[in-house]
């Protein structure tokens, strides 16, 4: 490893306050594997502090792959777009790099098309415009993906697209040529197969054409029984186009898959093509879900009660440190927004009176609070029980369920699952849902592979709180009341009243 790579590695390590294995498991419950590749695996995990599911990509650091690993981390740190997978935290050890990312709940574009056969043009247009928005953002940032294919594009249940896996991506300067041959043969541009210096953004345009063709036909444009014949067909740039496709779409496909890269359009030029702008020329706003530079004071105050420092929160967001503080803030804010978007089934109340949160489940738990300097306390541990990596408790006794006030925990809440139709009691998002296990469910597909989670096994819970904690819960409750305008009052909360979980 060269000195430049060592400096980059040290830079990454400095961004992570918990740079050891214990740090990873102290913050996340590792669940089942949901994807794997040549030098990396992706696991489903649960953030202990918020109970939110995340994807943890584990990359082994080897001499040959080290520069590529660092490149992927840096690219994800640069990217902040609603249609690009969000990086939340980086934890690095001597042998591994852990990338904690948001969990995309849906299917890959490949699975989506295989199930549908092919998409109608208006359906394909809705997805393709999101891809264009993301790739235009990347190219403006000097990022080239180089492996854009249906397996690396996630489609969530609400139709939102997320581009994942920047493992072959790189950073380029204007006019810079690339030499590395990489990607997948059926999606590779002719100039890459010729092993000549190529323009990075232009090969992304070619793969966008192959992906669009796959969406509207259910097939790839270039296919053959051998690599040699496949390369020959790609270099010739000849493929069949179904006559049922509109003239505008046929024209767009021919532009995207132009064999000569000099004649191939840029992504910005594709975005104004008549087929793309038909119906509406509006594209996703890149600022829609960007990480805030200035934190919400109410969230900061609430996080302060569980050990976070206000200045550390502000610095972590402004400098994009991708540490524990930044991850906790981002996951908590997403939970709050999700809760605020929920429809409520409450009794009519006096419109002139602002509802206040209710202490629905007043069961309390005992937590031993131990905190390092400038590090938030994560009160999920119990001195009388041990939790294995897979989340199963070694204790055979049935403990009481962990509960916070409704502003901090979900009352009567089972382990979160991928099942969006599961019912549960209405409450404001939890800061400390102490679920120590979520077992996989073989029936549900999800993200970066085939994510599965289940509530078949009961979650492990900690023991009861001492009575003296009531004052603390009231203090945190007061701080959290400002977080969400849709917090129900005690009059409208019922333990037996469940409702459908929100569509994520």
Curated annotation (Swiss-Prot):
Could you tell me in which tissues this protein is expressed? Testis-specific. Expressed in the testis from 22 days postpartum (22 dpp).
Keywords attached to this entry: ATP-binding, Kinase, Nucleotide-binding, Serine/threonine-protein kinase, Transferase
Question: What molecular function terms (GO) are annotated for this protein?
Answer: ATP binding; protein serine kinase activity; protein serine/threonine kinase activity
**Bias category Polar residues: which stretches?**
441-451
Is Nucleotide-binding found in the keyword set? yes
Question: Residues in domain Protein kinase?
Answer: 28-276
Disordered: annotated segments: 389-421, 441-468
The UniProt entry, under Pfam families, shows:
Pkinase
UBA domain sequence ranges: 294-334
Q: Which family does it belong to?
A: Belongs to the protein kinase superfamily. CAMK Ser/Thr protein kinase family. Smok subfamily.
Output the PANTHER family linked to this UniProt entry.
MAP/MICROTUBULE AFFINITY-REGULATING KINASE, SPERM MOTILITY KINASE 3A
General function of this protein: May play a role in sperm motility, especially in the regulation of flagellar function.
- Provide the protein name: Sperm motility kinase 3A
Q: Which organism is it from?
A: Mus musculus
